[in-house]
């Protein structure tokens, strides 16, 4: 990759001026302050988890609330918040979510060997905060999806440095808080990293089993939450889901057919992610695109599937912008993001309950765009990995910029 003035990658990785950082800090501070003013309890979604923890402290079952969709270990993790007054949570939660989103972006940059002081570091996060509506939604909701947005790039960063068991432990810890990153265990399976796979499975299993023993309803997750997730019976929640299985029936497609199409698309996405992994090309794109592909495939079929779930995969893809052949260099990546521009009004899709159609467009186009990476090898891509345990990703001596 050239670093001359005519090449955008060279410009992006040069140091950012102080004015860019000032703009970024102002934007993030304004986003957090706006959320603190609007949400008296630290965000609607965070309040569900905190309420579950308070119910448990009072001797009740957290799973009495059908909207509590977390493992028992999340109840104990929310206890510190349950002990804080609402006035503190009102400020603390949006600030914490904003910091975690910035940390997720930093991990994605480090994975791609992009300097943290670069123009891409400043402009990328500013663009996400200003130009990607789910960023603001996540800050206002305080949803624990933010733990997954940090854990995935952090785990892939560890894996890129050969610390696979640590990567598995990070994924396991994130699943213990919210089981959103469960599909990433397939990456460890693809790579033949059995210790990492064991860590990713055992950490949430042991944490949840220990926490369940302290619950009045130890099997509540399996008897109440899991059936709710499998059947998606909440009509109100369904209006905000972005998966094809939820959106297509609203367009008149039979529910069974919609579910079948979503499952088929998810399976195809996993196959493409596997093919992407089998390409032994050096550099970080292999890890980033495989991980993002697995998560986007899961979002096609998962219930629920909300717009802010996209933030789990998007930073990984955007941080690869300096690399030729990356997803972010393709036009369809940017087309997918157009419906998420704040303030852009779409005819017949103005209402909040209809934004799921825009979210579904973004999800599906991103999923297809990433999946294509598994079938269209760029020029200079390495040979396929032989059968058996996958080797360490080949380390380039330096970033190509």
Label every model-predicted segment:
Residues 165-179, 183-188, 293-300:
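Membrane-interface alpha helices of multi-pass inner-membrane proteins
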Residues 1-165, 194-314, 318, 322, ...:
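Primarily membrane-embedded glycan-assembly and transfer machineries that use lipid-linked glycans
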Residues 327-401:
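Transmembrane helical bundles and short interhelical boundary loops of multi-pass, membrane-embedded
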Residues 127, 172, 308, 332-335, ...:
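Residue-level detector of alpha-helical transmembrane segments in integral membrane proteins
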Residues 191-202, 327-333:
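Membrane-interfacial entry segments at the cytosolic side of transmembrane helices
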Residues 71, 79, 133, 178, ...:
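Hydrophobic alpha-helix-in-membranes signature
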Residues 135, 168, 293, 330, ...:
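Residue-level detector of transmembrane insertion/anchoring sites
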